[in-house]
UniProtKB/Swiss-Prot annotation:
NCBIfam families recorded: PfpI
Protein name, UniProt field: Putative cysteine protease YraA
Origin superkingdom: Bacteria
Domain PfpI endopeptidase: 3-169
Gene Ontology BP terms: proteolysis
Similarity field: Belongs to the peptidase C56 family.
Pfam families cross-referenced by the UniProt entry: DJ-1_PfpI
Organism lineage string: Bacteria, Bacillati, Bacillota, Bacilli, Bacillales
Active site: C103, H104
EC number per UniProt: 3.2.-.-
Length: 169
């Protein structure tokens, strides 16, 4: 049986931070479900990549999935303006399911009180936000802290994908 990975994504995501992990997960036999505030629409990445949204966040539950991916770009900042994406991500962490967040992706976790004491990385411009949320910020290509995998930039995708897949085993 194929595992399902939820992907929280909206307009202005960093294209390669969506396409590269999704390709890695699909090649490893996982199915991916794109989730935004409303289903059926198409969202566009910063460089023109199009993603059709499969499900609205109000129609899904973390228990339906085995892991969560949060790509970076401006998408996480737009998503966190609504409480539901953070609550959705919080359910994964609390249920010890993997959460993969790259670049600005950890922004979705900032308001959840889940970062306290965890080693986390992310894009340098959100470093202070992560520290203020209680995270131990690490400037490393990939950081694995319990069930959360984080990376800084698209340059870190190889390590990010590798550690994400390792956590899924």
């Amino acid at each position: 049986m194929s595992k399902k990975i939820a992907v929280l994504v909206t307009d202005q995501f960093e294209d390669i931070e969506y396409t590269s992990p999704v390709k890695a997960y699909e090649e490893a036999g996982y199915s991916v479900v794109a989730i935004d505030l409303e289903a059926g629409k198409e969202v566009t990445g910063k460089h023109g990549e199009k993603v059709k949204i499969d499900k609205a966040i109000s129609d899904v539950d973390a228990s339906d999935f085995d892991a969560l991916l949060i790509p970076g770009g401006f998408s996480p900042d737009l998503l966190r303006a609504d409480d539901r994406p953070g609550e959705f991500a919080k359910a994964f962490v609390e249920n010890k399911k993997p959460v993969f967040a790259i670049c600005h992706g950890p922004q979705v976790l900032i308001d959840t009180d889940l970062l306290k004491g965890k080693d986390i990385t992310g894009y340098r411009s959100i470093r202070k936000d992560l520290i203020n949320a209680g995270a131990n910020y690490k400037d490393a290509e990939v950081v694995v802290s319990h069930n959360i995998v984080t990376s800084r930039t698209p340059d870190d995708l190889e390590a990010f994908n590798r550690e994400s897949l390792n956590l899924l085993k």
